[in-house]
Structures are given as structure tokens and as C-alpha cells.
């Protein structure tokens, strides 16, 4: 399983990014949100979702890339909803920022979801009903609020990602791990990875 790809941005369009890493060019489908983040950058890192389809006439293997773990987590939640496929989920994340999407689902705002191309009344309702509690339980909304809170010291994303990865390898779930790590780094943004992990082990449940 590919967790993320880091390398040189070889090509970029609003729908796709090509990253060259260790001599291999990886083509990843992206949202407009991720496209905006990548513009003007040379060295990039994208969190990966692998979509493998088998059993039909044409098997397929597609990579999707996301600028943040939160956007990827939302994508993975969206594709669990009946009627929301890979392209529809990407369209939603191209039309609405991750933070806005969390607020829309939490507030039950069907109208805003219906403004996305391809989303009708029933699909909008299913997204809200199916994901409202899951988003709260996952901690995604809390992470996004912490990242965007005015006056919050900048968090070293490399330290954050490595700490979350370490906790995941130790057997903890990614969502609560990310929430605890984000909380620690918001309060102490200069902590090294090993100290973040040690503190997280005392706090994570």
C-alpha cells in the first residue's frame, strides 16, 4: 500500500499531477483544492489513495493524490456513500474545501451539496446522513479547525506526518492519532518527532 509519494512535480493540470520519485513518474488524479496547493511548487508530497477495480472486463489501478491527510480522509468517507463514486467525490472536493465540506455536512446543508455538479437531493441527503457522525468520530473537523485557527503557530507537517505514521505502525488508528498529534504540535510546534510520539502515547486512547 502506498501512503504518500514525495518527489519532483513533473506535470500538473487541474485534474492530474505527475510526480517523479526515484526515476518513476506517478500519475495521480487530484482535486482542484490540491491543484491550487501544488501550483508553483517543484518538490511536492501527496497522500495517496489506491483504487483497484477487478472482476470486470477491464481491471484498473488508479492513484489519487491529496495535499492533506484530511482531504484524503474525506474522500475515503465520501466514496462509502451509495451513489458517490470516485469522480463524484473528486468533484465535491474540487467544488468545496475540506473545511467547508465538514461544516456543510455538520449543518445538514443540502442546498450547498446540491450546488455541486452531479449531486441531487437524494445523494445530498445520503451524504449528510451517512457521514455526519463519522466525520465527528474521525476528528477530521477538529484537525481542520486547528490547522486554520488564526494565530495558531505553524505546525511542521513533516514532524506531524512522521509522528502519525509511527503511531499507526504501533497499532493506533490514524484518525485519533492525527488528532492527538495535531493537538500536541499546536501547543508545542517545535517538538521533535520522538517527543511528540512519547507525549501522544500518554494521551491517545
Task: Label the model's feature ranges.
Residues 89, 101, 124, 177-181, ...:
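Small-residue helix-packing motif on alpha-helices
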Residues 7-9:
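Conserved hydrophobic positions within beta-strands
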Residues 73-77, 88, 109-112, 159-166, ...:
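A general alpha-helix detector
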Residues 11-111, 127, 137, 144, ...:
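Long, highly charged, low-complexity intrinsically disordered interaction regions
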Residues 1-5:
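Short coil-to-beta-strand transition motifs
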Residues 119-137:
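Alpha-helical interaction/regulatory segments in DNA maintenance proteins
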Residues 140-142, 146-205:
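Low-complexity, acidic/Ser/Thr- and charged residue-rich accessory regions of DNA metabolism proteins
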Amino acid at each position: 500500500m502506498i501512503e504518500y509519494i514525495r518527489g519532483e512535480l513533473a506535470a500538473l493540470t487541474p485534474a492530474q499531477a505527475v510526480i517523479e520519485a526515484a526515476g518513476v513518474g506517478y500519475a495521480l488524479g487530484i482535486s482542484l483544492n490540491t491543484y491550487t496547493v501544488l501550483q508553483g511548487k517543484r518538490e511536492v508530497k501527496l497522500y495517496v489513495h489506491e483504487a483497484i477495480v477487478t472482476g470486470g472486463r477491464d481491471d484498473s489501478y488508479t492513484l489519487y493524490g491529496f495535499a492533506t491527510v484530511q482531504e484524503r480522509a474525506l474522500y475515503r468517507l465520501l466514496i462509502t456513500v451509495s451513489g458517490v463514486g470516485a469522480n463524484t467525490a473528486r468533484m465535491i472536493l474540487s467544488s468545496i474545501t475540506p473545511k467547508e465540506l465538514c461544516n456543510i455536512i455538520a449543518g445538514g446543508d443540502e442546498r450547498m451539496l446540491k450546488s455541486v455538479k452531479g449531486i441531487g437531493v437524494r445523494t445530498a441527503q445520503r451524504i449528510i446522513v451517512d457521514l455526519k457522525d463519522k466525520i465527528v468520530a474521525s476528528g477530521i473537523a477538529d484537525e481542520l479547525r486547528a490547522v486554520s485557527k488564526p494565530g495558531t503557530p505553524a505546525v511542521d507537517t513533516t514532524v506531524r506526518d512522521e509522528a502519525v505514521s509511527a503511531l499507526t505502525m504501533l497499532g493506533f488508528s490514524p484518525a485519533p492519532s492525527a488528532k492527538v498529534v495535531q493537538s500536541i504540535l499546536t501547543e508545542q510546534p517545535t517538538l521533535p518527532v520522538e517527543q511528540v510520539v512519547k507525549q501522544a502515547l500518554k494521551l491517545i486512547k
